[in-house]
């Protein structure tokens, strides 16, 4: 008996890919639970056939069997045996004329795969990819999965380190860096939610499928915990977009207004970044529960419900893009006011533009208004590749630009290095003196003086 139904695994892969990539086109109505229920009915009919069908004449023949994919009759030795594509497949209507094949050897045994205990099967006529343009080969989906998993892992690690740096250095505590820290937190939560979501999908569409734990799989899909995982992911993604919007608004405020209350405006930013996403994620969850309570909420049969989340995110992307254009105009005017040559202006403008793109998420505009139900074939793959690759590595770029290459952060590290070197030299110099001429109190005294001078220097540099 085969350990995993290959075509059913492709069906689950399709559902899993949709859960990772976004909403499902409205025309697709087959859910995982429906597929499993049809598979169970197919298995029941097959077991009845295996029991009631008359046996072949005496002699060698391959035994009838159900291999968790198709129902096979007795096979004459030395011949191919074919049966119609199983009708429980989500795409069965498009492969009505197709067949799946096995080979019965002359010894009366089903042919097995090389170096495997699994029987050989030819499923080419029943494969869903024959339908053409809507879905992608498993290799392409796997490559996308690897790319964004690596991206989120690198971003998560870099953002945790960057957050520790901004929190650890007292002189870096200011409104601007508090906003950066909240942006880092939103990227970290987004990465964590993606990891948790992928772990849930891996169990549902891989482990449970391979072990045929259909009851456990369906009960998990219908559980509150599974839905909360995807609801949390939607909130983390939305909060990330709105903290990017906060960064854009704060940058524009610095350039356009000379005087404003940072403490008061920071409270407003907190409300926008963490509060506004609740205003549309919670209603979306309520609508899903009332009108589209299917499975684990990984797919959207009615795209109008998905717009409850999509439109506010498009609004944030659009506003940030307008801020990006406005900031570039301000940068150009300031560069021209400094009477710089055209070459220098172009170089600095290019540098500013490339820096602002990841910081404001401007790349999202490329495919932001190409709805998932309208993207097909190559366009959909390009859209998925662009969004998943850029978004997953965006946190890494933000950590680098806002922290690792920041002049203030580098200055703090240089001061720490200088202080450590000064204290180390004092200890070496004191230890080289004779004990009778150098009391132990002078060591602490010298270190205190060095530290106080460093502290005064730090305070003056930040005053």
Swiss-Prot record:
Localization, UniProt: Cell membrane
Description of how the protein assembles with itself and partners: May form homodimers and heterodimers with GIPR.
Highest taxon, organism lineage: Eukaryota
GO cellular component: plasma membrane
Additional remarks: Selective recognition of glucagon-like peptide over glucagon is determined by residues located at the C-terminal end of the glucagon-like peptide.
Tissue: Detected in pancreatic islets (at protein level). Detected in pancreatic islets and lungs.
Transmembrane segments: 140-164, 176-201, 228-251, 266-290, 306-328, 349-370, 384-404
Protein name, as recorded: Glucagon-like peptide 1 receptor
GO process annotations (BP): adenylate cyclase-activating G protein-coupled receptor signaling pathway; cell surface receptor signaling pathway; hormone secretion; learning or memory; negative regulation of blood pressure; neuropeptide signaling pathway; positive regulation of blood pressure; positive regulation of cytosolic calcium ion concentration
Keyword Signal: yes
Cysteines joined through disulfide linkages: 46-71, 62-104, 85-126, 226-296
Modified residues (ADP-ribosylarginine): 348
Site (Interaction with the endogenous ligand GLP-1): 121, 128
Family: Belongs to the G-protein coupled receptor 2 family.
Gene: Glp1r
């Amino acid at each position: 008996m085969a350990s995993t139904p290959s075509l059913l695994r492709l069906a689950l892969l399709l559902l899993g890919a949709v859960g990772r990539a976004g909403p499902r086109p409205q025309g697709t109505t087959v859910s995982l639970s429906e597929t499993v229920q049809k598979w169970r009915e197919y298995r029941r009919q097959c077991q009845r056939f295996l029991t009631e069908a008359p046996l072949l004449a005496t002699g060698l023949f391959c035994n009838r069997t159900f291999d968790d994919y198709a129902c096979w009759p007795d096979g004459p030795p030395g011949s191919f045996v074919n049966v119609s594509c199983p009708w429980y497949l989500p795409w069965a209507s498009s492969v009505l004329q197709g067949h799946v094949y096995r080979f019965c050897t002359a010894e009366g045994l089903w042919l097995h795969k090389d170096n495997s205990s699994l029987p050989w099967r030819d499923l080419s006529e029943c494969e869903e990819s024959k339908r053409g343009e809507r879905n992608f080969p498993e290799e392409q989906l796997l490559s996308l999965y690897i790319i964004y998993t690596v991206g989120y892992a690198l971003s998560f690690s870099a953002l945790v380190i960057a957050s520790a740096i901004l929190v650890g250095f007292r002189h870096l505590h200011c409104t601007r860096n508090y906003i950066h820290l909240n942006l880092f937190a939103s990227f970290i939560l987004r990465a964590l939610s993606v990891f948790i979501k992928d772990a849930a999908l891996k169990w549902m569409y891989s482990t449970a499928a391979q072990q045929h734990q259909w009851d456990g799989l369906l009960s998990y899909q219908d559980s509150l915990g599974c839905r909360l995982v995807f609801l949390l992911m939607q909130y983390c993604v939305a909060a990330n977009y709105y903290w990017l919007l906060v960064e854009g608004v704060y940058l524009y405020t610095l350039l356009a207004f000379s005087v404003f209350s940072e403490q008061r405006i920071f409270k407003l930013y907190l409300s926008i970044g963490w509060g506004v996403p609740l205003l549309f994620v919670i209603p979306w969850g309520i609508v899903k529960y009332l009108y589209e309570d299917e499975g684990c909420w990984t797919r959207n049969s009615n795209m109008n419900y998905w717009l409850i989340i999509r439109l506010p995110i498009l609004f944030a992307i659009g506003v940030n893009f307008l801020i990006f254009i406005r900031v570039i105009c301000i940068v150009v005017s300031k560069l021209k006011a400094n009477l710089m040559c055209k070459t220098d202006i172009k170089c600095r403008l290019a540098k500013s533009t490339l820096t602002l793109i990841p910081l404001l998420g401007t790349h999202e505009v490329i495919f932001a208004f190409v709805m998932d139900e309208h993207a097909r074939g190559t366009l959909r793959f390009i859209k998925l590749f662009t969004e998943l690759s850029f978004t997953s590595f965006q946190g890494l770029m933000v950590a680098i630009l806002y922290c690792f290459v920041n002049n203030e952060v580098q200055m703090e590290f240089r001061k720490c290095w200088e202080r450590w070197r000064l204290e180390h030299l004092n200890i070496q110099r004191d230890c080289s003196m004779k004990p009778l001429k150098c009391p132990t109190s002078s060591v602490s005294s010298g270190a205190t003086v060095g530290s106080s001078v460093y502290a005064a220097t730090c305070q003056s540099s930040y005053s």
